[in-house]
């Protein structure tokens, strides 16, 4: 983090959610596959899943006393037919702002 220094590394934290597709979304996505274009229903589902997993990870970091998470990574996997997991993880840390450097009066 620019302007900050990691003073303590706490632990790996994670969050996940498992979501299933909706039959109505599947039908619309199937039609969209024929004509092409963005599958907005799935884009929205993925965004909701990402936010939920992130909030769970942040809550775990806060329980440890962290004020930042570094090295965040996302992963997805199929759990069952029609159900997928979105998994996010990172390292919970404590950061502090760097002390401002005072100008050297002898070396302008």
UniProtKB/Swiss-Prot annotation:
Which Pfam families does the UniProt entry name for this protein? Answer: YbjQ_1 (PF01906)
Which SUPFAM superfamilies does the annotation name? Answer: YbjQ-like (SSF117782)
Entry-linked InterPro entries: UPF0145_dom_sf, UPF0145_YbjQ-like
Protein family according to the UniProt entry: Belongs to the UPF0145 family.
Its name, as the record gives it, is: UPF0145 protein ACIAD2946
Organism of origin = Acinetobacter baylyi (strain ATCC 33305 / BD413 / ADP1)
